[in-house]
């Protein structure tokens, strides 16, 4: 019998990683213009494992600052609330993904590589477009495959079976999920994000990142996650580079002013961004969290 979305959400609702309480509160505080540095410091300090992960990531190659950051208040002042929010979400997502070592550890590393790449690409696209906050775009990109992460950790056999079906039959991973499980990782990820009280716009972006035209709250956020996902797959980063890849959404391309004929150029510019950026270091960010958890 296959698990339902509701059963999986209930299974992970109270994960022993402080995500159910601390992370949503941090997100709300970072988005509140009235939150002070002292208040945010006090909130995050209630979870010392999160403090450790934040400082590890802040000093890693990926989120590195010009000088070493020694304390949480210093990190908040130097990096800003938006980046702190992204760091908190990055840390807790990695904690979930790398909390155990097993036969799927390398596979999860590929999932993380893809997720991080989509986050970076979404941030770059948002900066170029100018009407979406870059850090919100990063979070939407980073979490777009949250449902896949949940499956790989808590339903390993189903995850492996779906992955093999997608590769063997040359259908999309989403189609393989629907055929074998009756739900998609996008649906599961959105439900888990809602259970963790993440913002509704991010939940919607997760749910609709394969079909951004279905988004109604903030379509641009779903579109940027969709385009970034497509481009990172096109670059060959992640698990599903050999699976069927549908064409990018035309409305999303138009919204981001990317003519279809220009897609190869945009993807190549993204390749250069990754190649030139010391920050795109999956191993460094993974090691930072492994040392802290």
Pin down the residues of each PLM region:
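Conserved alpha-helical "signature site"
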Residues: 1-250, 287-288
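Terminal helices and disordered tails flanking the catalytic cores of nucleotide-processing hydrolases
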Residues: 1-8, 250-293
């Amino acid at each position: 019998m296959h698990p339902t979305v509701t059963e999986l959400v209930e299974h992970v609702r109270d994960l022993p990683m402080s995500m159910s309480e601390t992370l949503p509160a941090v997100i709300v505080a970072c988005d509140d213009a009235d939150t002070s540095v002292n208040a945010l410091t006090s909130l995050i300090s209630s979870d010392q494992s999160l403090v450790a992960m934040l400082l590890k990531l802040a000093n890693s190659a990926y989120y590195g600052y010009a000088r070493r950051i020694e304390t949480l208040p210093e990190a908040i002042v130097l990096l800003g609330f938006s980046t702190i929010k992204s760091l908190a979400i990055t840390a807790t997502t990695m904690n979930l993904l790398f909390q155990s070592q097993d036969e799927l550890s390398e596979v999860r590393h590929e999932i993380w590589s893809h997720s991080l790449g989509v986050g970076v690409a979404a941030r770059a696209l948002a900066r170029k477009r100018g009407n979406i906050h870059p850090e919100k775009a990063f979070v939407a990109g980073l979490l777009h495959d949250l449902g896949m992460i949940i499956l790989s950790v808590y339903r390993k056999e189903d995850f492996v079976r779906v992955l093999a079906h997608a590769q063997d039959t040359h259908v999309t991973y989403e189609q393989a999920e629907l055929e074998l499980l009756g739900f998609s990782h996008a649906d599961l990820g959105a439900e888990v994000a809602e259970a963790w009280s993440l913002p509704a716009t991010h939940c919607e972006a997760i749910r609709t990142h394969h079909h951004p035209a279905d988004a109604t709250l903030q379509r641009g956020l779903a579109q940027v996650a969709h385009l970034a996902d497509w481009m990172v797959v096109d670059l060959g980063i992640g698990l599903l580079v050999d699976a069927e890849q549908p064409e990018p959404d035309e409305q999303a391309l138009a919204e981001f002013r990317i003519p279809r004929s220009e897609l190869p150029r945009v993807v190549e510019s993204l390749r250069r961004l990754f190649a030139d950026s010391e920050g795109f270091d999956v191993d460094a960010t993974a090691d930072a969290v492994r040392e802290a958890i």
